[in-house]
């Protein structure tokens, strides 16, 4: 049997680009994209992507060149997920919330040859490019020479602004100028070839470039649509940024299911509610912060949801109270876990039929867990990262989430040191702390660096935050370590409250004493107008830890804490 050879008929490189070809052949007349008053079919989308790919090649884009895009969830961003790799290039979607300096750093590090910019972000892009070519920036980046990417405007498809300057290329112009006969055949020679370059939004350092292979992107897409049990012809609302892990790979996944992409520029309550009712949306993804947007919507912004909308939520673990409230509006929540380095969805809280008999509160508690491994991932475990031994399935012992599978990134671009830190003994170390329950479901407790060590006890900042969020006058909460002379560290809470002016620090502490063991109760509560966050909405806990130092109690005779089973690399 070993002598039977591979050939073109039985071995083909895996790539998510085949999902578009299949959608064109199988669902040609189905609606592929809706954006304001514009609509496309899968036949039109396929042909537009082919034309754009041919135009990119005419601009001397060759294999493995990086093409960056700074744009919201508009049709152009979606189409480039296919057209750019069709041309043999690597797509880099840039977080639109980043400041010009971070955009300049990404453009420099990625060596982008082209930069597609939506008209709303032209000024930000201009500032980034000015920084890119400035002497101070070049010196700070230890660069001898930085090449300027060619800028291509993305005007609004439905309501063009016509701000295109003379001699400046525009997206639709490239689409229409492309070769209508262009048919990408055998565009992927090796499934290990790169398809996208995504930059992490780290809260402690400059972003790192994460490289995915065609094979990894293909399997990650299957992970998401199978783990979510997404059927055919979904109507998917783009409330999740496409720049965030390629929309958790659903940029390719909606094509795989022959669905409809409902594109929106802004994630507002009115946009979400109106598009759900107008287009009969069946699926959407978001971070828990979007739940707050929907719950706080004004009466004129709301619409009645008559058919349940399946919502996959990731990011920070949502409080069980928040899940309960959002489901009362007509949303059905599925909790997942994923990180940029793993190519999207890694764990999903797969529903068990016996849970149907439980109370709504118990169901919400179960849904708040991150769940079990998706199908196409080889293995997931929670390990003591010093010994690499698995933790017991008792729901109490914390360890680091470790992953293994073909959907894991190729590695960090131009960063051997970081690669050596995260790949260990055949596993990828995520930096996330979790427990495993008796039923095998994982529950994230914290980031490794955010664990609070108080008198030798490991305290999950997320558990403390969830307890605080149960208070009716609290909108958001973040908990970090604060120095303490006896215990080493104790929890310090930063809270955003409602307009109730009566709530005091003592009220939060009394509330926490009812919800938590004494050693987990915050010793200080600081009220803020808003929490410091990164461009992707992650709380900047490093900044909060610096603030908490000023609230700490110091005693030079005793400032040590016993660290138990924390990852050695942190």
Swiss-Prot record:
<feature type="short sequence motif" description="Microbody targeting signal">
    <location>
        <begin position="568"/>
        <end position="570"/>
    </location>
</feature>
<dbReference type="GO" id="GO:0005524">
    <property type="term" value="F:ATP binding"/>
</dbReference>
<dbReference type="Pfam" id="PF00501">
    <property type="entry name" value="AMP-binding"/>
</dbReference>
<dbReference type="GO" id="GO:0009698">
    <property type="term" value="P:phenylpropanoid metabolic process"/>
</dbReference>
<dbReference type="GO" id="GO:0106286">
    <property type="term" value="F:(E)-caffeate-CoA ligase activity"/>
</dbReference>
<dbReference type="InterPro" id="IPR045851">
    <property type="entry name" value="AMP-bd_C_sf"/>
</dbReference>
<dbReference type="GO" id="GO:0005777">
    <property type="term" value="C:peroxisome"/>
</dbReference>
<comment type="subunit">
    <text>Monomer.</text>
</comment>
<comment type="function">
    <text>Involved in the biosynthesis of floral volatile benzenoid/phenylpropanoid (FVBP) scent (e.g. benzylbenzoate, phenylethylbenzoate, and methylbenzoate). Catalyzes the formation of CoA esters of cinnamic acid, and, with lower efficiency, of 4-coumaric acid and caffeic acid.</text>
</comment>
<dbReference type="GO" id="GO:0009803">
    <property type="term" value="P:cinnamic acid metabolic process"/>
</dbReference>
<keyword id="KW-0587">Phenylpropanoid metabolism</keyword>
<dbReference type="GO" id="GO:0007623">
    <property type="term" value="P:circadian rhythm"/>
</dbReference>
<dbReference type="InterPro" id="IPR042099">
    <property type="entry name" value="ANL_N_sf"/>
</dbReference>
<dbReference type="GO" id="GO:0009723">
    <property type="term" value="P:response to ethylene"/>
</dbReference>
<dbReference type="InterPro" id="IPR000873">
    <property type="entry name" value="AMP-dep_synth/lig_dom"/>
</dbReference>
<dbReference type="GO" id="GO:0010597">
    <property type="term" value="P:green leaf volatile biosynthetic process"/>
</dbReference>
<dbReference type="GO" id="GO:0016207">
    <property type="term" value="F:4-coumarate-CoA ligase activity"/>
</dbReference>
<protein>
    <recommendedName>
        <fullName>Trans-cinnamate:CoA ligase, peroxisomal</fullName>
        <ecNumber>6.2.1.-</ecNumber>
        <ecNumber>6.2.1.12</ecNumber>
    </recommendedName>
</protein>
<keyword id="KW-0067">ATP-binding</keyword>
<dbReference type="InterPro" id="IPR025110">
    <property type="entry name" value="AMP-bd_C"/>
</dbReference>
<keyword id="KW-0576">Peroxisome</keyword>
<keyword id="KW-0436">Ligase</keyword>
<dbReference type="GO" id="GO:0009800">
    <property type="term" value="P:cinnamic acid biosynthetic process"/>
</dbReference>
<dbReference type="GO" id="GO:0106290">
    <property type="term" value="F:trans-cinnamate-CoA ligase activity"/>
</dbReference>
<comment type="similarity">
    <text>Belongs to the ATP-dependent AMP-binding enzyme family.</text>
</comment>
<dbReference type="GO" id="GO:0016405">
    <property type="term" value="F:CoA-ligase activity"/>
</dbReference>
<dbReference type="Pfam" id="PF13193">
    <property type="entry name" value="AMP-binding_C"/>
</dbReference>
<keyword id="KW-0547">Nucleotide-binding</keyword>
<dbReference type="InterPro" id="IPR020845">
    <property type="entry name" value="AMP-binding_CS"/>
</dbReference>
<dbReference type="GO" id="GO:0052315">
    <property type="term" value="P:phytoalexin biosynthetic process"/>
</dbReference>
<comment type="pathway">
    <text>Phenylpropanoid metabolism; trans-cinnamate biosynthesis.</text>
</comment>
<comment type="pathway">
    <text>Phytoalexin biosynthesis; 3,4',5-trihydroxystilbene biosynthesis; 3,4',5-trihydroxystilbene from trans-4-coumarate: step 1/2.</text>
</comment>
